[in-house]
Amino acid sequence: MSDIAITISLLALVAVIGLWIGHWKIRGVGLGIGGVLFGGIIVAHFTDQYGLKLDAHTLHFVQEFGLILFVYTIGIQVGPGFFSSLRKSGLKLNAFAILIIVLGSIAVVLVHKIADVPLDIALGIYSGAVTNTPALGAGQQILAELGVPQTTVTMGVSYAMAYPFGICGILLAMWLIRLFFNVKVDDEAARFNAESSQDKESLHNISLKVTNQNLDGLTLIQIPGFSDEEVVCSRLKRDDMEIVPKASTEIRTNDILQLVGDDNSLAKMRLIIGYEVDAPTVAYSGEIRSERVVVTNEKVLGKKIRALGIHQKYGVVISRLNRAGIELVPTGNTTLQFGDVLHMVGRSDVLNQAISVIGNAQQKLLQVQMLPVFIGIGLGVLVGSIPFYIPGFPVALKLGLAGGPLVVVLILARIGTIGKLYWFMPPSANLALREIGIVLFLAVVGLKSGGSFFDTLVNGSGLEWMGYGIFITFVPLIIAGTIARLYGKLNYLTICGLLAGSMTDPPALAFANEIKEDNGAAALSYATVYPLVMFLRIMSPQLLAVLLWAA
């Protein structure tokens, strides 16, 4: 067999062994995808003993391409929610997540400066301690740019030393915070549910009876609130007649209007129109029905709702729009993106015609448009290769193969659609590509570092590196968790999701969810901080490398 064939065969063997190890669980906690790294270490130990030669160029390509695939799919996943997570509702949680990252970075500086740990090893320990594999790839990239040799081996070994406690340390921090503050989980869940019902920003339906005499004879568009497009009127009931109103529909006293909007906007409409009634909020008449429709027609992508003329042509109202899990009040200026879910209301005989304009082709949601994938990867690699200079730094900075694709795809996923191209990927396809990418990357890291792993653990500084990893994992989590509880007054279940999200650690999220299975506090806070944290986890080792190299 050729060296390339042997190399690829061993990579497959590493993946099989590693994924098998990752499925081992102790009390519900396992290594997960990190098992591939240890699979690589085991295989590398025996390849060294038997003198098998691996092709270095193949390993290098597979490692870099795996990292690019992983980072790209992460960006596609979190891109639509990345910028919205920075809004006011998530500022406090993201601030605490940033605090954890900053404290972890300070811990790395202390380990490097006080304990005199080499920079490449310190960054490897950091990546393992925070269980973030893209951080490992980003650190290796920047150190290679700085001219540090053999970073794959040293960083891979130190990463492997710190990784196991990186997973366990998060769970231990959750348990200690619960113990220290004497938390009663049921009380925390009840408090979260009560606060959620008060603060929830999702859209609601109400029906208002027109009692304001000043509105009699006005068209819908002339009434404040409708003209500002703060709310949508999905139905109008007059006596026994029920219609989907247009902007030009005249309003009469005693008409009943069904409105859709957020709580604040609906409260304003109560003051303008009249009092709330129960009558038509649930049942639709035989002539009027509603449908949830997914935007899949490439001809409408990037167009404004007003330009489609759906309301004017068919008398159909788009009352809600769900984009990446976020509910919006659609206006005439709202631009449609692939995968948007619209709530459409109209007469049965014309609603299907309006739906055909939007698309609603479910099979398209299962297809992957490959052209945008390679455009995103290509642009990302180019952006990652562009040097930018900062005064006082010894070398030009680059985003690298980890940061470049991430930044580019975050922007593209946020834009969503350019012409007929759309940056949308079905969750199953995204997960498959992401898993393939990270398995390839970790398999190579394990193979490259496995030869020296056991020697470092038994005869070298392996146990010392584990200690530094525990310090980097544990101290930031405990400090931030305590401050969040003591001064931030955060719910304990929310803190658990925050801690898991700050480490981008799905096993920790699973553990947090099991604390109170019927409560969504942990998952919500995890999702809120995840996009920003993933970005900062990839950028932080690069900044640390340059700052400590220049110091």
Swiss-Prot record:
It comes from Haemophilus influenzae (strain PittEE). Keywords: Cell membrane, Membrane, Repeat, Transmembrane, Transmembrane helix, Transport. One of its GO terms (cellular component) is plasma membrane. PANTHER family: K(+)_H(+) ANTIPORTER SUBUNIT KHTT (PTHR30445), TRANSPORT PROTEIN YIDE-RELATED (PTHR30445:SF3). Signal peptide: none annotated. Its main location: membrane. The lineage of its organism: Bacteria, Pseudomonadati, Pseudomonadota, Gammaproteobacteria, Pasteurellales. GO terms for biological process: potassium ion transport. Belongs to the AAE transporter (TC 2.A.81) family. YidE subfamily. One of its GO terms (molecular function) is monoatomic cation transmembrane transporter activity. It is a multi-pass membrane protein. NCBIfam families: PRK03818.1 (NF003007), YidE_YbjL_dupl (TIGR01625). It comes from the Bacteria. The chain crosses the membrane at residues 4-24, 28-48, 65-85, 95-115, 157-177, 370-390, 402-424, 438-458, 463-483, 492-512, 529-549. It holds the Pfam family Asp-Al_Ex. This is Putative transport protein CGSHiEE_03135. InterPro entries: AAE_transporter, RCK_C, RCK_C_sf, Transpt_YidE_put, YidE_YbjL. Residues 191-275, 277-360 form the RCK C-terminal domain. It is found in: Cell membrane.
